[in-house]
Amino acid sequence: QGAVGAFMSMAAGYGIKPANILAAVRPIAERGAWEKAASKFERMPQFGLDIETWTALRYVVDGWRAAHPSIVQGWWDMQDAVIAAVETPGEFVRMLGGRIRFFCARDRRFLHMYLPSGRVLSYFQPRIVEPKRKDEDTDEAEAAQDHNDRRRVVVEGRDSKRGGKWGKISLYGGLEWENAVQALCRDLLADGMLACEEAGYPVVLHVHDEP
């Protein structure tokens, strides 16, 4: 769900510099789509990039989103469901025909996500906050600015992006989907490992991650 900031993080992981993306994208960019991407520069986190380089990254992001509208809508549906659950403590909020459910305790100490397996992910101290300011160079700020300054839910916990320090974590839709997919992959792996062992195939090594 992150845009330019997330794209930069991914590119860095592969040793790709933003300037190289600009060089590859600019000559083949469709004019209207390029101008539309560039028009977002002033109101979005800029991550220290000049407008041309920023626009090149945003152009790629916009193109991917246009090609995958169901995924994009899924981010916002998830974010809306989380907000609805916190706004209506004591009631279930359902997604995907009830395969994923959210429930916020009446005292609002915990928000629970019920997975298809029946396992539960719990988030401490959920509360609704206003969008981050556009001058904050974070994925959360970018996600908020990217969809009409939507509200979001924050919780408390150990933040892997800050070295595991305790603090506030933004539960925007993309992160909730990441949590759900990671947890689902773990459930599939655990079930498969037990099935293999029962069939006479001992498990000697295993790993799981988001596909």
What spans do the regions from the language model cover?
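Electropositive nucleic-acid-contacting surfaces
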Residues: Q1-G173
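Active-site lining segments that contact anionic ligands and/or coordinate catalytic metals
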Residues: R108-F110, G118, G200-Y201, V207-E210
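Active-site palm subdomain of RNA-directed nucleic acid polymerases
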Residues: P18-N20, L188-H208
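Glycine- and acidic
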Residues: I169-N179, H206-P211
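Conserved pre-motif C helix in the palm subdomain of viral-like polymerases
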Residues: G174-L194
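Acidic/histidine-rich catalytic cores and adjacent linkers
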Residues: V154-E156, R162, A180-L184, E198
